[in-house]
Amino acid sequence: MRIRGVTYDVGTPVINGGLTRETLPLDLVEQEMQVIAKELHCNAVRITGQDIERLKLAAGAACRHGLEVWFSPSVHNANEQETFQNMLEAASACEDLRKVGSQVVLVLGCELSVFMSGLIPGDSLLDRLAFLSDPSRWTADMLANGSPEERLNTFLARVATEARRRFAGPLTYASGLWEDIDWRNFDIVGIDAYRDGNNRQEFPGLIRNYTQFGQPVVVTEFGCCTYVGADDLGGMGWMVVNRQSTPWRLGKPLTRDESVQARYLTELLELFDSEGVDGAFVYTFVSPSYPSSIDPRYDLDTASYSLVRTWPAGNDAASQHSPRWERKQAFHAVARHYGKGNHP
């Protein structure tokens, strides 16, 4: 694959109202980008988050370490107008980066049918996911103004048109496998491709089908959690966390197993190579909002997709500016695979 990538979150809203990264010191971002480039052997990073200034900060650090930037604004639960304005602000930021020589791709949203409000009924991501999975709830009234799919494509066409007036670089969208996107509006086909127990057999064919559009295909996101059985859950592995508890805890006993995650990522990277995919971004580098614990009941890293295992922050200022994580088996597995293609 030409693009060897990983996602990097700069702060995304979580269900309890906080952020996945409460602070984002520049020196810490610089350290982590260096690890991504030099140890993980990435040549690209998909930077996600809601705050444009944080995205720009991380993008600058990534560029200084020779990484291609996939700029991915994400304002979860925003309505169409709020999302539209956020994307246009991102387009202007990307053009500023492009003009100083940075390699930048603008990702105009991620799985908006469930992350943006208004297309599918529901006040939250979880509500909309539940609605999406139950066709019996889809009524004629809901489809009166067009299907969610039709309205999503109309929205994306409008956003892409306006974004091109501000940004002269390539555009894509990070689509869910259930979304039927009109890729004529984009330069790159982007898919969030999680293999699970339900799609395991047809998964290679699902990936292959995206090549029909005649554009480069990039897996914008794929990953696996860190416990026995997580490979069968794919993109829903995070649902095992009890978020009603204070602090959060695992909702049931799990057997932590880093080899499950490492094997899953290796298998999919090999599959993407064999199917001629142009690139892929492993989800994700670090997840500070899912810290580990010596008490298995509170080891949230078990339910994270992170390549590194985060430990809780200390009370001293120094701990806020240095990595509090250790490399998992998945980190080394991805580094080995990407390292094989690490050539000019």
Predicted feature residues:
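A solvent-exposed, charged loop/short amphipathic helix patch at secondary-structure junctions
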Residues: 122-147, 232-255, 303-312
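Aromatic-lined substrate-binding rim segments of carbohydrate-active enzymes
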Residues: 32-88, 144-172, 296-300
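Short, acidic/polar
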Residues: 16-36, 83-94, 174-182, 262-269
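Active-site-adjacent substrate/metal-binding segments within catalytic domains
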Residues: 1-57
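Hydrophobic faces of well-ordered beta-strands that scaffold small-molecule active sites
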Residues: 2-8, 43-47, 69-73, 104-108, ...
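Aromatic-rich peripheral "rim/lid" segments of glycoside hydrolase catalytic domains that contact
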Residues: 7, 18, 281-344
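Glycoside hydrolase catalytic-domain groove-lining segments
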Residues: 165, 170-250, 266-269, 273, ...
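Active-site groove signature of glycoside hydrolases
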Residues: 43, 91-149, 172-178, 278-281
